[in-house]
Amino acid sequence: MLLDDKILDIFGFFRNAIEERIRAVWSGDNIPESLFKRIIVGPPAQPKHGDLYTNAALILGKFDKKNPMELASTLCNAFENIEGIESINVVAPGFINFHCVNSVWHGVVRNINKLGREYGRTDLGHNKKVNIEFVSANPTGPLHIGHARGAVFGDVLSNLLKWVGYDVIKEYYVNDAGSQVKTLVSSVFLRYKEALGEEITIGAGLYPGEYLKPIARDLVEKYGSDLLNASDKDEIIRSFTLSSMLNLIKEDLALLGVEHDVFVSESDLQNRNVIEECVKYLRERGIIYEGVLEKPKREDELSEWQPRVQMLFKSTEFGDDSDRALQKEDGTWSYFAGDIGYHFHKISRGFDSMIMTLGFDHKGYVSRLKAAVAALSNGKASIDIKLYNLVNFLENGTPVKMSKRKGEFLTVRDVIDEVGRDVARFMMLTRRNDVVLDFDFAKAREESKDSQIFYIQYAHARIRSIVRRCPELLAIEKIDFSCVITEQELSLLRLLSRWPSVIKTSAENYEPHTIAFYLIEVAEAFHALWGCGNSDPSMRFIVEGDLHTTSARIYIAIAVSHVIASGLDIFSITPSEEMR
């Protein structure tokens, strides 16, 4: 059986083959597994160096205290019989480059056409449960556009992990027990009076947003003026307003294509004494004590510090830089106590793998949350906290004012109205999540290469167009892909062969933006190959009078469309069948 008939992940195959032969060469020595994790097998930065390379000689040279160039020569001898390798060469300071026979890349076309959109899918997760908490914005107003980046990141990461075999729960933590909710209730009551015809003045510290007016009108419609003197008006307004605000947030998220599986209420956890249970559990394990915190060195933590005896969590025993207070001076639970109780609740629900997204301004919470999860689970559970940075909104390079009028900000609805859901989702993933993102509305609206999602969709639509124009193809089993020999064609096939590795790496590192980068690269490579046909008719996808070459190239195009469609599916973006 030929290699091209059985290998679905080319780079995975070569990595395994190279690692196997390294172990054979060092059969008498114990090479630490950590070294193998540092060995790279992948495409070189410059295609002229070969189809793939490895840094194995450099990594193992340090371990074995041998000259990397000499070690590389030894390894070359061991690698010579790897199936699919045409030639091997060594370059300083010890890199090993490989050139593959063309049939390796031809096999990629066959396999993608056989698997369709399933190409690249793996069972990396083995159905392991993962809890991904994201957005969790305070229910005091509609979603600010700053939340959209975290929403899209969390949603696409959830899709990606599901795609590789994880059992994912998408969760939203409703912060409905803090002082901001009391302020919200006071603000709505004021608007309620206004809806009844009273003149009002919005005091300092209250929420002035126009979005509260419909809630106030709904209260009037349901209760008339009865709430003005009702003893339980605060609880009625609180319950009604939080329900309304949560529905508003869900509607905004739906505009982005985001839907959570579970909403967990902070006040519900408090009413069920979850924090008390958590504190009892930690106290029994000797992880809580009464003491005075040292004065913090960090400026941003000074406002929370008080030189008094209080209930403290031994956070430093679990990697944090300071122990943490669990109660305020008035005896109520601290913000951190609420967080630690919430994660106690997650663990009690059977989650030992958790992911959480936070705005970059919350980076100080990372170490304390990791410490909390380690303490609560006795080191058996883990939490990964992904920080997302700011979004700068621009119009032709000029900053867009975030504040449109008093109390109102650029919202998710505003952005979706401007560019549409698919464009907004993709744009949010065109940079690493922890890097500031420039979102230019003018570029997003363009139907050109400057709009990356348009360029990707255009590639998919072009392919669907040529497939419709050429319905009669030879069966792929009958095609000899040896006619596919130009560098432009082969480089596109090499790129497609990377898709399984891109998926695996993106999922392992929780970095969905790498899929966006890859899809852009695939679209560019396809359009470049298409462009070759403009100057050279023999390079066109449909070659008049040559059904064999035409079929081979259209199967390549179909392979491209499957990969693009798979990537867009992970982004919850519908691939375009035609451009209008």
UniProtKB/Swiss-Prot annotation:
Reactions catalysed, semicolon-separated, are: tRNA(Arg) + L-arginine + ATP = L-arginyl-tRNA(Arg) + AMP + diphosphate
Q: Which GO terms describe its molecular function?
A: arginine-tRNA ligase activity; ATP binding
Q: Name one GO cellular component term.
A: cytoplasm
Q: Does the keyword Nucleotide-binding apply?
A: yes
Instruction: Name the PROSITE patterns for this protein.
Output: AA_TRNA_LIGASE_I
- Where is this protein primarily located? cytoplasm
EC assignment: the record states: 6.1.1.19
Q: Where is this motif: 'HIGH' region?
A: 137-147
Task: List, alphabetically, the InterPro entries matched.
Answer: aa-tRNA-synth_I_CS (IPR001412), Arg-tRNA-ligase (IPR001278), Arg-tRNA-synth_N (IPR005148), Arg-tRNA-synth_N_sf (IPR036695), ArgRS_core (IPR035684), DALR_anticod-bd (IPR008909), Rossmann-like_a/b/a_fold (IPR014729), tRNAsynth_Ia_anticodon-bd (IPR009080)
Q: Where in the cell is it found?
A: Cytoplasm
User: Would you identify the family this protein belongs to, as annotated?
Assistant: Belongs to the class-I aminoacyl-tRNA synthetase family.
Q: What is this protein called?
A: Arginine--tRNA ligase
Per the UniProt record, the lineage of the source organism begins with: Bacteria, Pseudomonadati, Pseudomonadota, Alphaproteobacteria, Rickettsiales
